[in-house]
């Protein structure tokens, strides 16, 4: 691959010494690295056996490989690299691929350093004689290769001109004229750039296609009968870069958009004068109605005054009605909230276990359940008929209580009417007595001395 010299061999040896540790860590197993070096007589049989024994004695493999590479450094030969980077080793040790590439790069860099200097310096020493484009530009891409009829055309040796891409050079070439008229953009150090007639015809066709899209205005070209003037104008159109064409197209689009916007604004103003949108409020509606009614009343001043008075009155009424509606809605919402709170509290009171209704109560029986607050018990009608001071109520614990004691147990001792404090089946004893379902004595409890 490379012409081997002493200098190159020395460079490879230095790189080998530099990469010994990397090579040692790239070898992750003993086979076939040790066997390859032994079979090619780079290491002796004794070193081969000692290396295997060291691996069996749990010496790190990378350290053993590094010792072998150090011994190969003493008698370094380029053939060592061929054996080290053989196909078998590269397949068994994938980490060696990157190291192999680094050695190959060393050879490339050495050849580039020792390559004879190019003749480009001699060409640059005499800039007056001119130079070719190929010596300055990098090698062109295949899709940008020049045609055969343009390869022989002379070019000017100008650093600014050569830095441009080949496509821009083709676009900026002027068209030939009967008399070689130099143009301001094409003169470079007293030399002109000729272009073939085919490119001139191609540019003429492209310009003729683009001309109908341009609007008539200040950008229109003034015609002249003289052939020289026509050639100058056509050459100037050819010299227009794509950036200038894009700028002109943007100007045309902006001009057309502004014109359309002006045409659209006029009917919008007319519509606003006749009909007002709902978002403009009551005042704009009043103005629209006033303008209509003034037209209907033949622009009489008296009618206008009457209409304005009526409209003002309507506007006031509308404002007052709106304020009243807002206040009503606010009161409704507050009333709903309060009503909701009341209903919730009423529901809570109805959920008291002493006030629940039970349709299965038989008032003809001598006993029926009663409640007073949180106290529950059983009322005996026969004992109640004897008097309020009699123990006629038996609580849940089985104790006999008088009406007053039962009120104390239910924390209703302060009630003025004990018949309203004691309930049965969700109704007070007063209500049951009025319905004829219960017979009670006088509302005040009798004293013991009576």
Swiss-Prot record:
InterPro entries: HSR_dom (IPR004865), SAND-like_dom_sf (IPR010919), SAND_dom (IPR000770), Sp110/Sp140/Sp140L-like (IPR043563)
Motif (Nuclear localization signal): 251-266
Region ranges (Disordered): 131-156, 170-225, 238-283, 318-360
Subcellular location: Nucleus
Post-translational modification Phosphoserine, affected residues: 175, 177, 226
GO cellular component term, pick one: nucleus
Record keyword Cell inner membrane present: no
SUPFAM superfamilies assigned to the protein according to its UniProt record, in alphabetical order: SAND domain-like
Bias kind Basic and acidic residues: ranges: 197-212
GO MF entries: DNA binding; DNA-binding transcription factor activity, RNA polymerase II-specific
Coiled coil, from the record: none
Disulphide linkage map: none
Biased segments, Low complexity type: 143-154
Residue span, HSR domain: 1-108
Residue span, SAND domain: 358-439
Top-level taxon of origin: Eukaryota
SMART domains associated with the record: SAND
Bias-annotated ranges (Basic residues): 245-267
Swiss-Prot/TrEMBL keywords: Nucleus, Phosphoprotein
Ranges of biased composition (kind: Polar residues): 343-353
PANTHER family the UniProt entry points to: NUCLEAR BODY PROTEIN SP140, SP110 NUCLEAR BODY PROTEIN
Name of the featured protein: Interferon-induced protein 75
Species this chain originates from: Mus caroli
């Amino acid at each position: 691959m490379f012409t081997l010299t002493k200098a190159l061999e020395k460079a490879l040896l230095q790189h080998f010494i530099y990469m010994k540790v990397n090579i040692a860590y790239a070898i992750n197993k003993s086979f076939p690295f040790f066997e390859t070096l032994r079979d090619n007589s780079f290491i002796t049989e004794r070193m081969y056996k000692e290396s295997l024994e060291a691996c069996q004695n749990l010496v790190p493999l990378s350290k053993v490989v590094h010792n072998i590479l150090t011994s190969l450094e003493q008698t370094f030969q380029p053939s060592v690299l061929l054996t080290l980077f053989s196909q078998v080793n590269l397949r068994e040790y994938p980490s060696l691929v990157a190291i192999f590439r680094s050695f190959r790069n060393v050879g490339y860099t050495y050849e580039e350093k020792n390559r004879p200097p190019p003749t480009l310096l001699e060409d640059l020493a005499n800039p007056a004689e001119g130079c070719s484009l190929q010596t300055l530009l990098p090698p062109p891409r295949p899709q940008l290769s020049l045609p055969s009829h343009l390869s022989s055309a002379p070019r000017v040796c100008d650093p600014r001109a050569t830095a441009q891409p080949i496509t821009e050079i083709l676009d900026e070439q002027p068209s030939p004229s009967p008399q070689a008229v130099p143009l301001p953009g094409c003169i470079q150090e007293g030399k002109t750039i000729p272009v073939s007639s085919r490119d001139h015809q191609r540019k003429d066709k492209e310009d003729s296609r683009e001309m109908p899209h341009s609007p008539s205005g200040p950008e229109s070209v003034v015609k002249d009968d003289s052939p020289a003037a026509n050639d100058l104008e056509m050459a100037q159109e050819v010299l227009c870069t794509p950036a200038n064409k894009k700028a002109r197209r943007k100007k045309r689009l902006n001009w057309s958009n502004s014109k359309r916007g002006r045409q659209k604004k006029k009917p919008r103003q007319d519509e606003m004068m006749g009909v007002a949108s709902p978002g403009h409020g009551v005042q704009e509606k009043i103005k629209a109605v006033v303008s209509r009614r003034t037209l209907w009343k033949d622009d009489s001043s008296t009618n206008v005054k009457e209409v304005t008075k009526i409209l003002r009155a309507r506007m006031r009424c509308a404002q007052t009605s709106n304020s009243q509606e807002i206040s009503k809605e606010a009161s409704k919402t507050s009333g709903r909230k309060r009503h909701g709170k009341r209903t919730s509290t009423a529901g809570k009171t109805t959920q008291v276990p002493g006030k629940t209704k039970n349709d299965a109560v038989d008032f003809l029986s001598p006993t029926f359940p009663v409640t007073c607050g949180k106290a529950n018990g059983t009322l005996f009608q026969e004992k109640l008929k004897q008097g309020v001071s009699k123990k006629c109520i038996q609580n849940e614990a089985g104790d006999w209580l008088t009406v007053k004691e039962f009120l104390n147990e239910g924390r209703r001792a302060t009630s003025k009417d004990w018949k309203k404090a004691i309930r049965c089946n969700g109704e007070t004893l007063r209500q049951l007595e009025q319905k004829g379902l219960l017979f009670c004595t006088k509302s005040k409890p009798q004293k013991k001395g009576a």
